Amino acid sequence: MIENYILMHKGGQEEYRDSVFVNYSSALTMAILYLPVEAEFSVADEASVQALVQASSKMRFTDLSESVYPILTNLRNYMLIRIDDKTINIERHGKVFAYIVQSGELKMLPNGMTSLEDGDRVICCTGEFMRCLNDIAILSDAVVSDSAEEWMDNLVCRISDKNRLSEGNLTAVTMIVRSGD
């Protein structure tokens, strides 16, 4: 099982522009779209990505990636994720980030597949979310948190201390692998 917590906050902006689409099935499949103010992305394209993610439980990850690529070709900042209690597969482009806390160490996740173990923690987020954080903050909050929600709360408190959540949209997902559940 993958415990997860999703944050979507408009920050100091008039509207929330990023998108997170999720499919909960035997594996958790997700698309995170980072839309800075200057980015243009149509509602129809957004709906197409959402529909593909919703139908993705019967697709291989590479097929999903190939299906969304023509839609997202002009959007420079996005991430596709498929995670279960054994592996995570990521495809990220632009200013979106994925980190894993494994055996007390923080590492940036590369594109492709990575093995997971019980208790591993993963954060996927936009560049705006990362702006006020550093590796030590992410790692220390991950190791002291008992849940994905608590980890997110701790990170948001750090961001709030720096900018009172008054700047851009904040989008992130924290995940904890719970193999025994």
Annotated model-derived regions:
Residues 47, 53-101, 159-179:
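Catalytic core of PPM/PP2C metal-dependent serine/threonine phosphatase domains
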Residues 26, 94, 104, 120, ...:
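A broadly conserved detector of short glycine/acidic/proline-rich loop/turn motifs that flank catalytic sites
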Residues 27-28, 76-78, 119-121, 170:
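Short, surface-exposed beta-edge/turn micro-motifs
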Residues 66, 124, 153:
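Short, contiguous clusters of charged residues that form electrostatic/catalytic patches at enzyme active sites
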